[in-house]
Amino acid sequence: MFNDEARLKLLEGVNTLADAVQVTLGPKGRNVIIKETHLTKDGVSVAKAVKLDDPIANIGAQFIKNASSKTCDDAGDGTTTATILTRAIIQEGMKYLATGVDPYTIKKEIDSDVKIVTEYINSIKQEIDLNKIKQIATISANNDESIGDLLANAYEKIGKDGIITMEENKGSDTYIRVVEGI
């Protein structure tokens, strides 16, 4: 399988995974059932559950999984947004490849656009307060206000430069433990 046929198969995988994940976007995102037993609105969980039979399409899906996993690792959220943006970048890149633009030029343009978007985001960013942190955390926790309260309390205790690490608890209690640094 070469060129156009392979690109179409890759794009098929990208689209299949992105279609499954994009419905979870934002506070009004919909739930997705995974294997009859798991109901989730978490984009990264949906992405991890997608397995495609076609190996080339599966590589395309893996592009999306890698982007969403990296976003989750770096930011702790935003996996659905990363999925949607990655798909859009891949789709546009494929269009340019089909018209004969070389991959290096496409990459240079993407890098240039990333710089422009980053500068714009930095120009409109806003400081947030504990109430906003609570709102964001609540939304990220599928509207669980107790988690929103907990994270807002954690930020209040550690300050804006502190680091929060979450660990799974074997018990049923959810709690904060502050560990002083050096």
What are these regions (language model features)?
Residues 1-180:
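N-terminal glycine-/lysine-enriched basic segments
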